[in-house]
Amino acid sequence: CLERSMSTTTSHALPSGAQPAPRSSVLVATSAVAAAGTMLMFGMLAMWLKFRDASPLRESARGKMIHDWLPSEIKVPEVATNTMAFTMVIACVMAQWAVYSTRRNDSSHATMALAVTAFVGIAAINAQVAVYLQMGMGLTDGPYQTMFYAVTGTMLALLVTGVAFSIVTMFRAVAGRLGDSSVMSAHALYWYFLTAV
């Protein structure tokens, strides 16, 4: 009698539900890193603005009172800085192309997009080094120089991690591990973060 009641109850059981969505811990972790990096960079820029606001006033060549925060002998090379800004936009396009190729299971295009992203990241690092060399100032030459190297050095470190992320993700694409697109999406998110800050 007991066997009969057990078979009856199992025949009336509900079917199993749908499988839960796969967890995208890489994407969540990258989002957390991007949020922390954004807070870091905006905190550093807030300190920069506070430093600039606390600088003494002087009369400009036009007769207006301005903050004397940038030493007169320092000139920021605009070509290298504008080139760096433009290359960051290209890196975002290439990172998104890698996501697009991954969703279509196209390993060769995903690999090429990631290689170009890494190359463009290296170009941005090169542009920052060119800015350092053209400006020709030392880290301890004054408060402006120290703040400049602190902010740009932090961004340079973030760029190096972006290039490393691109290379590791590229090796994953070369191996044909394109089943989960969350790694590529996390990679693209990181490059969006780098471009935004």
Model-derived segments and their meaning:
Residues L2-V197:
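...captures the hydrophobic TM-helix bundle architecture rather than a specific catalytic motif
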